[in-house]
Regions:
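Non-catalytic terminal/accessory segments
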Residues: 1-209
Length: 209
């Protein structure tokens, strides 16, 4: 028979990302309000860029040096999100506060298996098919170490990509029909171009393949 679920959305359904954005848009603004958009007594924005984006460098300096606020930034795609903090103690507080806010405000629970605090100086964190950590690269003007992102294709995604490419090559080798061969070559090239376009932003993608 045909079943009609009363809760949740189908895995991979096109409506799922849309609903996630509608519901979790409030989470984005809540995290931003804890740091980037925290109201200040004085307006520290002195210029507006050509694309109408305000220069918040002075505001950020004041928040970092004149307050006890926990610096944090959120990056989200659908229901998958990361919150970045400068210190582990801040990350622990933000982690607990976010779980509580999601439950109290949206009646949502985070996945215990997928949710954890990661030290990006020591370990990778995975997000949208990438794995990332930070590494030292020179020093800042004040003498403190400067860190840059190291992004690679995550291990599971790399295995899946290689298997798919191998299967496509296998199909190509087994055909002797010229028209089918042409279509398989097009399919193989389209797949590789798609993979390249998606992962080209990774800093170490040339070492992954």
């Amino acid at each position: 028979g045909v079943g009609f679920p009363e809760k949740g959305t189908p895995q991979g359904g096109i409506i799922s990302p849309l609903l996630s954005n509608i519901v979790l848009n409030e989470l984005d603004w809540w995290v931003v309000s804890q740091w980037e958009e925290m109201p200040t007594r004085k307006n520290y924005v002195h210029r507006i860029y050509a694309n109408d984006t305000p220069d918040k460098s002075c505001t950020i300096w004041v928040l970092r040096n004149k307050t006890n606020l926990k610096e944090c930034y959120v990056v989200r795609y659908a229901d998958d999100f990361k919150i970045f903090c400068k210190k582990r103690s801040d990350a622990v507080k933000m982690f607990e506060a976010t779980k509580k806010w999601l439950m109290d405000r949206l009646n949502l629970q985070v996945s215990p298996e997928k949710s954890k605090i990661v030290n990006l100086k020591r370990h990778y964190s995975e997000f949208l098919g990438f794995k990332m950590k930070v590494r030292k690269k020179g020093k800042c003007k004040n003498g403190n170490p400067k860190y840059v992102i190291k992004a690679c294709v995550k291990d599971k995604a790399l295995i899946k990509i290689r298997k798919k490419a191998k299967d496509l090559i296998g199909s190509l080798r087994q055909t002797y029909d010229k028209h089918m061969e042409y279509r398989l070559i097009q399919k193989y090239n389209a797949y590789l171009i798609g993979v390249h376009n998606y992962y080209c932003i990774a800093t170490y993608v040339n070492l992954d393949f």
